[in-house]
A protein has these predicted regions:
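N-terminal low-complexity or simple alpha-helical regulatory segments
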Residues: 1-123, 145
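Short acidic/histidine-centered micro-motifs embedded in hydrophobic/aromatic stretches
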Residues: 30-34, 166, 258
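Hydrophobic alpha-helical core bundles mediating ligand binding, dimerization, or RNAP-core interactions
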Residues: 54, 96, 143-146, 219, ...
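Extended mid-to-C-terminal alpha-helical interaction segments
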Residues: 169-272
Length: 272
């Protein structure tokens, strides 16, 4: 299976990078990957390209907290389906449940869920792949997105007191005045934050009233989840190729590079 993420998220991140003074096209050109920010937002991009782009942009900006900076400019609520799900939730607990389902539907190979404990509910994210150099910015980006969903009910000043980050650490966090005395642990495949149960009945509100993302006339969650990335190599490659077609048919070498395979090995796989 080829892990994919929605191009719409890449577009939001690319816009945030431009606002932070980083040239999106310069980063993509340096990395030798397609300009996904110019593709159909309804299409899909490899998760690996998304990760490499954030890391490359962080190096261009010379920032150790670039993952947080991107998420602050392009808040999780700018994804219209997430914003509308939060808006229709009766309380923070319902918003967290919906957000987990929608964020999982936004990519494959990644699982989101709520882990119920006696004093807190943990928002958890599991990735099948082990971390590599440069993934710190992606983990920052993921952590900030989780926190922003909770802030819709707890207020913008809220920060988790217990955090689990994927990797072996250390991963840079905002200054102490923002993160407080949070207890941070590391796990090989999971990132998570603890939300106190006292916050769960809180009503939710938007923290991004000036979002430039247009509000959809209707929100159809089942349809959205049915269009999640394909779970087989051939189907995933079809989705990628369709996304890239407006810019010309990609070569087998380009597709193989995206899939992380040798062109001949990919051809043999497709012939089977």
């Amino acid at each position: 299976m080829l892990p994919l993420s929605r191009v719409s998220e890449f577009v939001h991140v690319a816009e945030a990078c431009e606002l932070l003074g980083v040239s999106t096209e310069a980063v993509c050109r340096r990395l030798g990957q397609p300009f996904w920010h110019n593709c159909d937002p309804a299409g899909y991009a490899p998760v690996e390209h998304f990760r490499r782009f954030i890391d490359g942009a962080a190096h261009a900006a010379s920032s150790r907290l670039f993952g947080f900076a991107i998420r602050e400019v392009s808040r999780v609520e700018r994804l219209a389906v997430v914003r509308l799900a939060i808006a229709r939730s009766a309380n923070l607990y319902q918003a967290l449940m919906l957000a987990c389902r929608l964020m999982e539907g936004h990519s494959n190979g990644i699982k989101y869920w709520l882990d119920e404990k006696h004093d807190a509910v943990w928002i958890c994210r599991r990735s099948r792949r082990l971390l590599e150099a440069g993934d710190d910015m992606t983990i920052q980006y993921v952590l900030a997105g989780m926190i922003q969903v909770v802030q819709c009910g707890a207020g913008k000043a809220w920060w988790p007191k217990r955090i689990v980050l994927q990797g072996t650490g250390p991963i840079a966090l905002p200054p102490v005045e923002a993160s407080g005395e949070a207890a941070v642990q590391y796990h090989p495949s999971i990132s998570a934050i603890a939300v106190p149960r006292t916050l769960l009945p809180q009503p939710v509100h938007s923290l991004d009233a000036d979002s430039r993302t247009p509000v959809l006339a209707a929100f159809d969650e089942p349809t959205f989840l049915q269009t999640a990335p394909a779970d087989t190599l051939v189907a995933a490659l079809k989705q990628l190729i369709v996304t890239m077609m407006p810019h010309g048919c990609p070569s087998i070498e380009t597709v193989a590079e995206i899939a992380g395979a040798h062109p001949r090995a990919l051809q043999r796989s497709l012939h089977r």
